[in-house]
Amino acid sequence: MDARLLEILVCPICKGPLSYDRAAQELICNADKLAYPIRDGIPVMLVDEARQTVEGTPVDLNPGSVA
Protein backbone atom coordinates (compact mmCIF):
# COMPACT_ATOMS: atom_id res chain seq x y z
CA MET A 1 0.00 0.00 0.00
CA ASP A 2 1.41 3.34 -1.06
CA ALA A 3 1.85 5.63 1.96
CA ARG A 4 0.66 8.65 -0.03
CA LEU A 5 -2.57 6.87 -0.93
CA LEU A 6 -3.11 5.83 2.68
CA GLU A 7 -2.77 9.49 3.73
CA ILE A 8 -5.68 10.58 1.52
CA LEU A 9 -8.03 7.60 1.95
CA VAL A 10 -10.62 7.90 4.72
CA CYS A 11 -13.44 5.75 6.03
CA PRO A 12 -16.49 6.29 3.80
CA ILE A 13 -18.76 6.29 6.87
CA CYS A 14 -17.06 8.51 9.46
CA LYS A 15 -14.39 10.13 7.24
CA GLY A 16 -11.80 9.10 9.84
CA PRO A 17 -8.27 7.82 9.20
CA LEU A 18 -7.53 4.24 8.18
CA SER A 19 -4.74 1.91 9.25
CA TYR A 20 -3.13 -0.62 6.93
CA ASP A 21 -3.08 -4.27 7.97
CA ARG A 22 -0.43 -5.76 5.69
CA ALA A 23 -1.00 -9.39 6.71
CA ALA A 24 -4.76 -9.32 6.11
CA GLN A 25 -4.56 -6.90 3.15
CA GLU A 26 -7.19 -4.64 4.70
CA LEU A 27 -7.67 -1.01 5.64
CA ILE A 28 -8.99 -0.69 9.18
CA CYS A 29 -11.27 2.00 10.57
CA ASN A 30 -10.84 1.74 14.34
CA ALA A 31 -13.67 4.22 15.01
CA ASP A 32 -16.29 2.16 13.17
CA LYS A 33 -14.57 -1.20 13.76
CA LEU A 34 -14.63 -2.01 10.05
CA ALA A 35 -12.06 -3.59 7.76
CA TYR A 36 -12.09 -2.75 4.05
CA PRO A 37 -10.46 -5.34 1.77
CA ILE A 38 -7.60 -4.66 -0.63
CA ARG A 39 -7.96 -6.77 -3.78
CA ASP A 40 -5.20 -6.94 -6.37
CA GLY A 41 -3.63 -3.88 -4.73
CA ILE A 42 -6.83 -1.82 -4.97
CA PRO A 43 -8.68 -0.74 -1.80
CA VAL A 44 -12.37 -1.62 -1.99
CA MET A 45 -13.96 1.26 -0.07
CA LEU A 46 -17.55 0.04 -0.30
CA VAL A 47 -19.48 -0.30 2.95
CA ASP A 48 -21.14 -3.48 1.64
CA GLU A 49 -17.70 -5.06 1.16
CA ALA A 50 -16.39 -4.17 4.64
CA ARG A 51 -16.32 -6.67 7.45
CA GLN A 52 -16.74 -5.89 11.13
CA THR A 53 -13.68 -6.43 13.25
CA VAL A 54 -14.27 -8.52 16.34
CA GLU A 55 -15.52 -6.22 19.11
CA GLY A 56 -13.04 -6.00 21.94
CA THR A 57 -10.28 -7.71 19.97
CA PRO A 58 -7.73 -5.31 18.53
CA VAL A 59 -6.60 -5.88 14.98
CA ASP A 60 -2.85 -6.60 14.87
CA LEU A 61 -1.53 -3.91 12.54
CA ASN A 62 2.11 -4.91 13.04
CA PRO A 63 2.28 -8.70 13.01
CA GLY A 64 5.64 -10.04 14.02
CA SER A 65 6.63 -6.96 16.02
CA VAL A 66 7.34 -7.17 19.72
CA ALA A 67 5.17 -4.87 21.83
UniProtKB/Swiss-Prot annotation:
<dbReference type="GO" id="GO:0005829">
    <property type="term" value="C:cytosol"/>
</dbReference>
<comment type="similarity">
    <text>Belongs to the UPF0434 family.</text>
</comment>
<dbReference type="Pfam" id="PF03966">
    <property type="entry name" value="Trm112p"/>
</dbReference>
<protein>
    <recommendedName>
        <fullName>UPF0434 protein Bphy_0537</fullName>
    </recommendedName>
</protein>
<dbReference type="InterPro" id="IPR005651">
    <property type="entry name" value="Trm112-like"/>
</dbReference>
